[in-house]
Every structure is written in C-alpha cells, then in structure tokens.
C-alpha cells in the first residue's frame, strides 16, 4: 500500500510551466504564476473551470521572457500595490537582465502596466532566481540566482560574494527611498557598514 497518493486538486484547470502558487486572501483566490509571463487567479474550488488573468506581461512588454514571482504589498487593500520579478532581453545578442517592479492592480483585477515602477535590477542569465516575499517586518525579501549556467556550478564565483546582488537573499524597504534609489536599504541589514558590500544583502 502506498504511503500517499497524488490527486489533482483542480482537475479542470491546466497551466503551462507553473512556478509559484500562493493564496491571496485579498482576492479570496489562489494566485498562480506561469513562467511564460502570466499570472492567474482562481477560486479555491475543486470544480473551478476557468481563471482570471491578472497579468499577461509579454503581451504588453515583448522583451519580457519569464516571470518568476508575484506578490502583494502588506497594505494592498489600501494602496493596490503589487510586485513582480521578471527576466527581459536587453539586446539582439539575447543578453538579459532581471527586474523587480512595482505596479498597481485595478479594481477589475488587472495589472496596470502603465503604473510600472522599476525597483531594482541585476544581470540575468542561467540561474536567475527569483522569489518575492514580504516579511512580518514589512520589508521585501528577494532571492537572487547566480546568473550563470549550471555547469560549472557558480561559474561567476558569486555565491559567497557580498559585493554584488547575485546568489543571495536581499532585504529592502519599498515604502521609502534612499537618494538615487527606488527603495531604502534598512539600516539594520547586516552588511550596511561593511566596505565594499552591498547593503541590500541579507
């Protein structure tokens, strides 16, 4: 007798390359991210047959290649702010970047890309990451990949390098701004006062 048996929770729904599934209490629905640049909402109902497309990034931004994560601001009910992280192609040589952006969600449950505001970017390629989560402290936590191919591992030698943003966890405050930045580096981050280190690294 098997110890467990897998069953489809939503047998009527099909997705392509799903990479993230979260419960969004603000919508009273599940929120699912497809790698191919779409974000869906659907009811917590085994009989659900359709979804609401909250975001179709590639339709609006052809340079976008992948969406990895999508999350709502802790005060979303008041400010309608959401955050996404995606890859984009920089030029015809297919060099890429990874971008975290803020945008507004309309009352009709559509991402308004005209409100997009870039928060932070880093080089893309290979392992890009990434996941976004707000902590109980209200800070935005961002996981980043090492931006290189799997073989050899950590080809850019960035895994233990805190002088860049790659291969780590970042912690930033999106409700305030430092001069020249679209965010604030929290003063209690561990490497803020270390010469040569990126203060965003957590």
Label each region the model flagged.
Residues 174-177, 185, 196:
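Conserved small-residue
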Residues 141, 155, 163, 192:
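Short glycine- and Lys/Arg-enriched binding-loop motifs that mark or flank ligand-binding interfaces
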């Amino acid at each position: 007798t098997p110890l467990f048996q897998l069953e489809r929770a939503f047998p009527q729904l099909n997705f392509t390359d799903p990479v993230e599934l979260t419960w969004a209490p603000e919508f009273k629905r599940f929120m699912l991210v497809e790698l191919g640049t779409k974000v869906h909402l659907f009811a917590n109902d085994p009989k659900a047959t359709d979804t609401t497309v909250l975001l179709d990034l590639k339709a609006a931004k052809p340079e976008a290649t992948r969406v990895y994560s999508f999350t709502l601001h802790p005060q979303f009910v008041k400010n309608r702010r959401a955050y996404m992280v995606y890859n984009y192609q920089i030029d015809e040589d297919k060099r890429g970047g990874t971008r975290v952006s803020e945008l507004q969600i309309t009352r009709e449950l559509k991402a308004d890309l005209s409100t997009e505001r870039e928060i932070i970017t880093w080089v893309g390629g290979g392992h890009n990451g990434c996941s976004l989560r707000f902590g109980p402290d209200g800070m935005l936590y961002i996981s980043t990949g090492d931006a290189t191919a799997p073989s050899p591992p950590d080809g850019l030698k960035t895994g233990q390098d805190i002088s860049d943003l790659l291969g780590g966890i970042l912690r930033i405050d999106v409700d305030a701004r430092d001069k020249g930045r679209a965010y604030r580096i929290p003063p209690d981050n561990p490497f803020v006062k270390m010469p040569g280190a990126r203060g965003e690294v957590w």
